[in-house]
Amino acid sequence: MEKRILLPTDFSDNSWSAIVYALKLYKDEVCTFYFLNSIGIEAPTMTYTSNRLLKTMRENALKEMLELKDMAENSNINSNHKFDIIISSEDLNESIENAVNKYDIDLIIMGTLGATNIGEFFFGTNTVHLVNNVRACPVLILPEEFDFVEPKQIAFPTDFNHFYSEKEIEPLLKLADLYNAKIRVVHINIEESLDELQKYNLIVLKSYLHNYEHSFHWMPDYAKITTEINDFITDLDIDVLAMVNYKHSFIEKLIKEPVIKKIGIQPQVPFLVIPE
């Protein structure tokens, strides 16, 4: 079955790195990759000057998009990969939302947006905003200029307070299918014990993972969630971090941590954000 992948780009090295990652991730799959560039101009009303500017920006974007498409085709070895370009005059969030709906996108793969320049890598506040607003499609966000590593180990943090539907778990399973990845479910809590609701949600999650190699882990709640998750990633050589973005989820808790509010999310590996 053909997969449809959306690749937002600003023509930076970081966005090219995300494109290369996507091509390698789906190297054996039938895919159409959609390159998206947003040239939205923030203005209350379009004037003659802004219309001329928008036309110039669109012409420049088209030239760069065609060059980008040519680069992707020349560096690609899968004849079952197709490429298309989308140039939008709307802001990035609207551009992505419209593209997801129009082209029935399966996954968005992107580098960071609005990243800080303070030495360490962070998901910028623009990316955090995008994660909170894209609700129709999962998003795979990559660390800056991240070199492709086959996703063999996927971490899935949960507190078991949320009932996961099959639709919510499906993007996780599809990613695991690509490279027969092991799914490591990690429960971060003060105590290892579960209440009745959590036990039920655990049973349901186990049923979804029945045909996949998986394991369950418990971590004490000893620090900030960012620290705990990064420790888990390091200890078990995790290749991808996956979470469902629901109310009171770990993603919401991450974003509410003071350091995240100021500078964004600090990942070590690609981060799959699945909408509720």
List where the protein language model places each region.
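Small/aliphatic-rich secondary-structure junction motif
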Residues: 1-52, 153-219, 235-238, 266
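A short acidic, glycine-rich active-site loop
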Residues: 52-63
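Charged docking surfaces used in two-component/phosphorelay signaling
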Residues: 84-95, 223-226
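Gly/Ser-rich helix-loop-strand patches that form or flank binding pockets
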Residues: 97-147, 234-236, 240-276
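A short, acidic, amphipathic alpha-helical segment used as a generic capping/interface helix at domain edges
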Residues: 222-234
